[in-house]
Amino acid sequence: MFLQQFGRGLRLHKGKDHLTVLDFVGHSRAEFSYKDRFESLIGRHSRDILTEVKEGFQNAPFGCKIILEEKAKEEIIANIEGYLRSMNKNRIIKEIASYHETFRDSFSLSGFLDYSHIPFHKIYGSMTWGELCKEAGVCDNVSPNASLIKYAVTKKWLATDSYSYFSQLIKFVDCGFLCDTNTFSEYEKRCAVMFYYDLFDKANNYDCIEEMFNDLATDELFIYELKEVLKYLCDRCSAPEKEDNSVYKEWNPLRLHGVYTKAQIQAALGLSTLERKSPSREGVERLKGIKLEAMYVDVIKKREEGSMTAYKDYAMNREFFHWETQNRVREGSREAEAYRKGENNMLLFVRQQAEHPDYKCRMGFVYLGQVTMKSVEGSKPMQIVWHLDTPMSEATYAFASQYKAIG
């Protein structure tokens, strides 16, 4: 029986509000992964799955419980620990060689991931796909820009969930970066700057987009691997993107409910350019020329072993979000008056916490679009309730309401 059937059964029977599932755990083959199964059950989570199993699935979906008998728990923990231990570079290289031997004519990154069940982030753990293929004897050369792909994957793209954005990058790659940048729309220009900050941490590596594209166009191996990576990333996207609802939608490359890194957001909104990277590390950022104000919210501000510390930033429901200003903002201040009068166009970005539980990178922010103030009270900090012009998704509400659930 599939998980979808459980949900369908509950929906079709109005008087049935809960479901009990008994699953029997026995010995399993070494390559079988309980990790994947439990991650599918829990969905978005703030801690690694091994910790969840050991501590009783504290982040199971609201209203759900997962209970394991002690022996079953021991079997599952041993399985996950063994699976994680075995996922080293040498095993991956061996799997690549085996896959190439069998599927020489249709060899691809996506095909290999389906064949081996090795997680994508493990491919770029210590090397790149091209470097691993060379070690496996599949190819002779590696792109001199391989490190750029590794940086983009490990620092940016593992935290990004936006089909529209990755699709635009594929368009750049499909023309081998030999694009006429002079004809780019404002949307395409901003996507190109986002891409620049996916590859580089600092500004001023290139004077213009055309110079960057011309440089990348000379590296065929880079283009080949980048296309493989982007196609896989497109296929794995699950964010329920919608058209932007802000006053900037004519040029804004961000889509409602898409998930983006802070650097991507800053590039998309013009807070960062090729010449200047935004220095902001605060939770609020303004672009006065177009009356834009971006709010970056971590629902869980600090994570310590065995504890959860949250502040009063949380979703009250799918349409209203409770937010605390910075501590310095007091009643009667210039900032407070700007909020009261609605002087700026407020854009809300929310993530569960800063550090990603599975990858060594920062989590991405869900773009919740333009918001308007419903109420304000207090001082230093002020408490503001924002009304979302478009309700957040159920998946976002599940983590964005955590403070309300535990506070």
Regions found by a protein language model. Give the residues of each.
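Charge-dense, extended regions
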Residues: F184-K301
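Acidic, glycine-rich low-complexity segments with interspersed aromatic residues
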Residues: C133-V138, V142-V153, W157-L169, V173-D174, ...
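Conserved segment of the helicase C-terminal RecA-like domain
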Residues: M1-S40
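Compact mixed alphabeta submodule
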Residues: P357-G407
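Short beta-alpha junction loops
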Residues: F24-R29, Q352-A354, S375
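Short, surface-exposed beta-strand/loop "edge" segments at domain boundaries and coil↔beta transitions
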Residues: T102-R104, P119-K122, C175-T181, A203-Y206, ...
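Long, largely alpha-helical accessory region at the distal end of helicase-like NTP-driven motors
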Residues: Y34-G176
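A short, structural micro-pattern
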Residues: G15-H18, G342, F365, G378-K380
